[in-house]
Every structure is written in C-alpha cells, then in structure tokens.
Amino acid sequence: MISGSEYHKEYMKGTTTVGLICEDGVVLATDKRATMGNLIADKEAKKLYKIDDYIAMTIAGSVGDAQSLIRLLSAEAKIYKMRTGNNMTPLSCTTLTSNVLHGNRHYPLLTQLIIGGYDLINGPKLFSLDPVGGINEESSFTATGSGSPTAYGVLEAEYKSEINIEKGLLIAVKALISAMQRDAYSGNGISLAKIDKTGVTLYSDEEIENLVKKVTKKK
C-alpha cells in the first residue's frame, strides 16, 4: 500500500509550466500530462486556473493539494470583491497564498505555483512560490516542473525585454513544445492564457493549435 507521502512524491515528477511577463500583460502556459511514477495517469490534466477576473495560476506537484488551494483562493477572491467592490490584486493573492503555504510548512502542500495577473494601477505582475510559501517576483519569466530545464533554454534564448503578449504567446508555446519533446513526464497538449487590462483570457484548443503551427513553421 502506498503511503500519503509516497503518493505525493509520485505526482511531483511530472509537468512543465511557464510564465512570461510582457509589456502589456502576462502569459501562462502548461502541458496537460499528469503522471504517477512512470504511468501517464491523465492526458487532459488541468494545470492552469483562473482565480479572479485579473489573476490566473499554474500548478505543478500534487494535484489534490493544488486544487484544494485553488478552491480556497477563488473563494477568498470572491469574498474580497463582495466586501470591497474591487478585484484582489495579484500581489494580495500571492501574499495570501504564501501565508497559507507557510502556515502548513510542517505538513507542506506539495505544490509549486506560478501566479500571473494584471494590476490596474501597477500593470502586469508575475510571481513564483515554493511549497512553504517563499515568493519570487519575476521581472521576465519563470518555469516549474520536470520539463523546466528545457523550457528555460528556450526562454533564455527567445525572451527579450518589453515584448508584447502576441510575441510572448509564441515564446511560451515554443518553450512547452521543446519541453514536451525532451521530458517524458510532460506532454499531451498545451493550456494557454493571457492576462491583460481586459482580464484573463483562456485560449481554446483551436487557437492554441494555430499558435503551434506558427511556431513549428518558423523552424
């Protein structure tokens, strides 16, 4: 019988997620494969979530831990909006997430997160968090999961400061394609979102396929 800790360790082996900060917003992207050891447990795993009108999050690690946290954050964002009439800022959401993770540091939620959002006053924001609540505010890009070393190679080569979302989407897709080609624990398609002054936009499979064709055509 597999223990809880062993179960979590199995699920931490897979995934590639990336986030890029652009001049006019943020781009988030993930693969769709969930693994349990060497088994592909799910080919349509959801790893990209809308938290609020202007905030989205990617997950890597234990699916159950991450989903529980997402439910909490979504509820808190709704309560905040009901009380204040305003959307929670990306920094506020990240701080809340950090506090929850740190509060569970003795029995940590085994997940690594990227939070992207658009602050109507301060513009696009991108953060990464470790399982015990450590926050890094990113000024360019970040990646998590087993495919991240390969993704970082593409991001380092392709990313330039002050790129727009249109270019950022293509870079994110290229990074995911490269990671899925090299990492056995990543694959089965891409999930993609942008966050700008109009809010969170989740891309359809057809829209993503068109971006994939643009990227592969350039090779």
From Swiss-Prot:
**UniProt keyword Transmembrane, yes or no:** no
- Which residues are catalytic? 15 (nucleophile)
Location (main, coarse): cytoplasm
- What EC number(s) does its UniProt record assign? 3.4.25.1
Q: Which GO terms describe its molecular function?
A: threonine-type endopeptidase activity
Where is this protein localized, as stated in its record?
Cytoplasm
Q: Which residues form the propeptide?
A: 1-14
EC main class here is: hydrolase
Activity regulation, in the record's words, is: The formation of the proteasomal ATPase PAN-20S proteasome complex, via the docking of the C-termini of PAN into the intersubunit pockets in the alpha-rings, triggers opening of the gate for substrate entry. Interconversion between the open-gate and close-gate conformations leads to a dynamic regulation of the 20S proteasome proteolysis activity.
Q: Which reaction does it catalyse?
A: Cleavage of peptide bonds with very broad specificity
Q: Which UniProt keywords apply?
A: Autocatalytic cleavage, Cytoplasm, Hydrolase, Protease, Proteasome, Threonine protease, Zymogen
Its domain of life reads Archaea
Which cysteines link up through disulfide bonds?
none
**Could you name the Gene Ontology cellular component terms for this entry?**
cytoplasm; proteasome core complex, beta-subunit complex
Tell me one Pfam family matched here.
Answer: Proteasome
Q: Which Gene3D superfamilies match?
A: Glutamine Phosphoribosylpyrophosphate, subunit 1, domain 1
The keyword Cytoplasm appears for this protein? yes
One Gene Ontology term from the biological process aspect of the record: proteasomal protein catabolic process
In terms of InterPro entries, this protein maps to: Ntn_hydrolases_N, Pept_T1A_Psome_bsu_arc, Pept_T1A_subB, Proteasome_bsu_CS, Proteasome_sua/b, Proteasome_suB-type
Q: How does it assemble?
A: The 20S proteasome core is composed of 14 alpha and 14 beta subunits that assemble into four stacked heptameric rings, resulting in a barrel-shaped structure. The two inner rings, each composed of seven catalytic beta subunits, are sandwiched by two outer rings, each composed of seven alpha subunits. The catalytic chamber with the active sites is on the inside of the barrel. Has a gated structure, the ends of the cylinder being occluded by the N-termini of the alpha-subunits. Is capped at one or both ends by the proteasome regulatory ATPase, PAN.
By sequence similarity, the record places it as follows:
Belongs to the peptidase T1B family.
Q: Which HAMAP family match?
A: Proteasome_B_A
Per the entry, what this protein does is:
Component of the proteasome core, a large protease complex with broad specificity involved in protein degradation.
Q: What is this protein called?
A: Proteasome subunit beta
Q: Which organism is it from?
A: Methanococcus vannielii (strain ATCC 35089 / DSM 1224 / JCM 13029 / OCM 148 / SB)
